[in-house]
Each structure stands twice: as structure tokens, then as C-alpha cells.
Amino acid sequence: MPPRKRKLEELKNEQGEQGSYKCHLCGQCFYRGCGLASHLRRHAPVTFDCEHCAYTCKHKYAYDRHLLQSHPELVESGPLVRMFKNEDEDAPMPILEREADVSDDAVKYEALSSFSEPEPISYKCPLCISTFGSHARAVYHILSHRVKLYQAPKSLKFFSRKTMQALGGFRLESQLMIKWRLQYDNRSVDEKRTRLWRYMEENFGHEHLKQPKLESDNPSTSSSFESQTNLNDSSIIKKKLVMKCGTVFGQRLIHDNTQYYLCRNCPYVSWNVSSLWRHFRHHIQKSKQSWTCIACSYSSSSRVKIDLHVKMHKEMPEIDLEFATWLRYERRINKNDLNKPTNKKKKPDGGNGSNHSDMRSLHAFLSLKNSKNNVVKHDIDAPTLHPLSPAPKLVAMTQFDFGEIVTYKSVNPLHQINKNNSNPTVLPNKRNSIKTSKSDTQIALSVKQSSSMKMVKVSPGKVYQLPKTSKFYRPESPDSLASNNSAHGDEIESTSSDQFQQSVKVPKYEDFLNMKPVMPYFQKQRHPLEAIAMYEKAKREYEKNHCFPNLPIFEFNIEYKNLHPLAKAQYGKNNMKEYFLNEMEVEKSRECTDCPFKHNDLQQFRLHRDKHFYGGSHTCPECNYSSNNHNQVVEHTFVDHYLSDVRLVEGLPSSDSEDDNIPVPPDTPQRKKKAPKRGKRRGW
């Protein structure tokens, strides 16, 4: 311990926590008298004012330091004397001034009218356009350029015994590894660093700057980039680290009283020699069972060490945040012993830097989303929403009077009529309409007569008029329909559509931002994020209710005998009672009206029918069957459409479910064979 510090410790032990020298103005205690004397200047009204700028201080050494740093050209040589002012002046305490020996022919400097701080010295990188205000940051940046000399090609990936071919790993003795080694720059590390070290010596104050430059040292370098530096205090000292056998395994770099140890074969940096020595052993000790780095001679039998080493060959980041992250990574590598076994569960980063756990969770989410449990029977809602449009001109519109029927685009091919059919019209599905010219028996077997498919003979000049019935429109909000029907069931039919239709207010952001305070002094506005969330929710509800179609609902139990098939199809969709009755008939028959599917199991049949009403991302090319599972749609197209055609031609049942109805003869019970009796053992 230094003597001054030891004496201070003795004073602290003698005087206790508080010193014996106490200031009578503020009560602060000091262990020494010099500390109290320096402290009393803070209470004195003495100030040192700079004549050339607005700088003011209370200590002489601070004033002299300011003159040397801020006004070096104005300071003249001369003895330092103590000048006393007259008693008439206000200053009661002496002021220190510098008396200059000025000759007659000396030029007097006038005070500066406007003072400006000198521009800070900028440190420019000789290898790129980066500029730094700190010398230490510039040194680290130049050191980061050396990893680019070892940057491996992007085509070569990491190493793994099990996934060597998938990730592109290479053995040390493989032909691809030898070929890449021969094509790689085979210069030594010292030769590769010649350009970098020469620029560091020129710009950061090495002794090599005074020596003449030799073109043979580095013929490929150029001096087009120069840095403006002015360093007097800090410098960089390098020293080679040599083994007993004469092999150079690294360099010691000293900067700002901090030692750094650099490996001569890779970008490894350490703060102690022992870590560098343990690291360099992986460069010289090789075996056939070891894995090697594709950018240097580093090898190890542990794949985890190889993966950690490959990360150091990546290009150095340039921003301050990533630079600090790199420093923490280097310190963590040096702190941990490389020979210490690491966690085997830790997996290396993939070639594209993706996280495997995130990919697994995403895959599980997608599989869960695609394979969600199907409900046995869904509630049948309104038909598929389409924009209201006039009926397609499939026939002459003057022949029919559709009455109050509102038409919309029908997705079901059963509701489409062929233009060329002027004879009695039949509405088969798309698959059977193609085979009309082949065989009449196939049409008779495949097409089923239903309520929506009847033969209607069209005669020109005859008009089909719907009976006059009162109508009402469904409100835009379906939730309000139940309460109105229960209380005013008779009055709804007499009201008009304009009176019954509710007016929906368009949501505005200002309505949710401003609120009525509970108390007078409470806040009158919500948080913008909360207001935006409420506005978006109201907007979605508005769009959902506003786009709900106003479909007419007719009275029930009305029979329309002479009704056009197109109008009847529209009427059946809008009349929910008849729609449910038709669906019940379809379920009783166990035969799908949109495709040739048949199944005796009601649960399986309902699951199939739901695919026709609830759309998916994949659609069958033969009908409106859709699902989010592509394989399910392909199986439906092949089994229900293509195989059913083959069964019809060959005279086989059109569905596998019909095979289940064939009684299976009971198996005749077989008699159990008697086990043979074991004979008695003979005596020995």
C-alpha cells in the first residue's frame, strides 16, 4: 500500500467516520487540513474570469488548464506573479494573473469577439467510409475488418454427423473440402494482415511510421484512404507470442493499458494467454474423428465447439448496439473454459438463421387449425351471401312473372338452366349433363327427382303469376328479429319495409375518443390506443350488419304449382321452412343432391353435406364441394365422381355404403380341437 494511502487509513481509524477538520460554514468534515483549505475556496467570492470568453472558475489550476486548451495561441511566456488590486476596488481577495515580458516591437493580441469551440477530431477507417469520434471505437472497428479475410463462402454451411448432407457439412479429408482449400487464398495470416496492420501503424501512432515503406511488403495495397488523427497519449503495441519450438501462435496487443491476445489463424480474441493457448491447441491437434472449420484449421471432436467457432467468422456488425453485443459475446467465450463440456441440447443455428422451436410451434398451430374437430351437424344459416343482381337472361323474361321474388347468383349448378333446352326442362347436375348424349339409362340412374328438380313444360304466351301475399323485410341486425316477432307478430305484416328496416349509424373515431366524464374533473378523452380498438370493433360490426341482405320472407304453407324452376329455386332458399323440409328429405334419402355421394350413416352423411355449404380454400371441379384439406377434396372427386361413373357402367352399387347392406352369412362355429393328452413319463 502506498504511504499516502496507508497514512490516510490510519487517520480514518484514529478519527473515526468523521474527520477532525470541520468547515464552520457548511459543517463538512475532512481528514486533512489541505482538504479543508481547498474546500474553503468554494465559499470565497473569488472567481477566475476568462478575458476571451465567458468561462468562470474558482481554482487557479482550472483557469490555467482552460487557457492552455481553449486559447493556446493567446498564452505568452512570462513569470507567474501575484497581483493585488487597490483598496478602492470591490474585489477583497487577491487574483492570480500572468505577467508577460512584452517588448516594444511585440504584437499585442486583442480579445476575441466571438469564440467557437474547436471541431472534434474525427477518426476515419482506412478500409471503409466509417468515421468515429472515439479512438478506442476506431481501433475496434479496424480489428473487425480482419474477420472479412476469413469469411467463408455462403454455399458452405455448418457441420453435423447426422445431417451432413442436408446442411452442407464437409469432412476434413473430403474431396469437396480439399478442392475448396486449394481454391481459397493460401497466404499466411501475417501476409493477409499486412495491409491492415500497415494502416493501423500509419494512423494510430506506431513506430513503424518512421520507417520507409517497401512496396514488396504489400504490393496490392494502395494509399488512397488517409485518416486525420492526432494521438499523443494512446498507442498500440504488438508483440508476437512464440512457443518453445518456435511456432508463433498469436499476438499480444496493448491499447490504453488493456491487453488483447489475438490468434494468428482465426479471429479469436482473448483477455488472457491461457485462453488463447487452449484455443490454439485446436489448430494444431487433429484426428480423423474430428470436425474442422471451413475457414481455418480449427478442429475439434465436439460439434458444439465447431458451431461456436464458426460464429466468430461472421462479418462484424457496424452499429454500436451490435458492437456491444459482440464484446459481451467475446467476454463470455473467454470466461468459459473451452474444454468444459457444453449443453448438448443446444442446437446450432440453421443456414437461414431461423428458430427451430418457432417453426415447430408454427407447424403445430397450422396442423391444429387444419385438423380442427368437425361438428356433427351445423346450424343451417342463410344461403351464401352474394351481391343482389337481376336474374340471368336464360330465357325470355317476358314469358314469366317472378312476382316479389328477389334473385341472387346461385352457386349450385342444379339451379342453372341451359339456353338450348326449349323442350321440357330438366335440371341435372353438371356431371350428368355431360353424359346425356351417351346413355339415357345413366341419367335415369344418377339423376334423382326432388322438389327443386321437376319437369316444367314452358309454353310461350302463358304467364305464371305468383299469388299476392304480404311481405316484410328481414332487419339488418338478425338479433332484433326475435323480440319483434314475439311482441308484435300481427303488426309486422301490415308495416312497410321502410318502417321496419333499422337505420345503422356509421361509426366515427371521434365518438370513441371523446367520452362523457363521470365527475367534472375527470378526463374527457380516452387513450388513443383504446379508442382505436373500440372504433375498429364497431367498424367490423357495422360492416357485418350493413352487408346482411334484406331478403323477403313469405308466408308459410303456400303451394306454387305452376312456378318456374329458377323462381322456385330462389323461393326455396329464401323460405327457411321449405328449405329445412327439403334438407330433411335429403337426409332421409341418404343421397346427396349435389353429388352422387350416398351413405347410410347419418353422421357421415351430415359431415359430407356440410362441405357443400361451408366453403373452404379447395373446391371440387365437379360440384360445389369444398374443404381446407386438399387431399380430402381430391379423394371426394375421385371416389364420389369418377369411381361412381365406373360403377354405373359396370352395374355395381354406386357407393360403398350399399355394400354394407348385403347380409353377411354367419360364420359356422368351428369345433375346438382337443389338445392331445400328454403321455406319462417313463421311469428312468
Swiss-Prot record:
Alphabetized PROSITE patterns for the sequence: ZINC_FINGER_C2H2_1 (PS00028), ZINC_FINGER_C2H2_2 (PS50157)
Subcellular location: Nucleus
InterPro entries: Zinc_finger, Znf_C2H2_type
Keyword field: DNA-binding, Metal-binding, Nucleus, Repeat, Repressor, Transcription, Transcription regulation, Zinc, Zinc-finger
GO biological process, one term: positive regulation of transcription by RNA polymerase II
Keyword Transport: no
Gene3D superfamilies linked to this entry: Classic Zinc Finger
Effects seen without this gene: Loss of function results in a suppression of sel-12 mutant phenotypes, possibly by up-regulating hop-1 expression.
Gene Ontology CC, one term: nucleus
Protein's name according to its UniProt entry: Suppressor of presenilin protein 3
Source organism (scientific name): Caenorhabditis elegans
Name of the gene encoding the protein in the UniProt record: spr-3
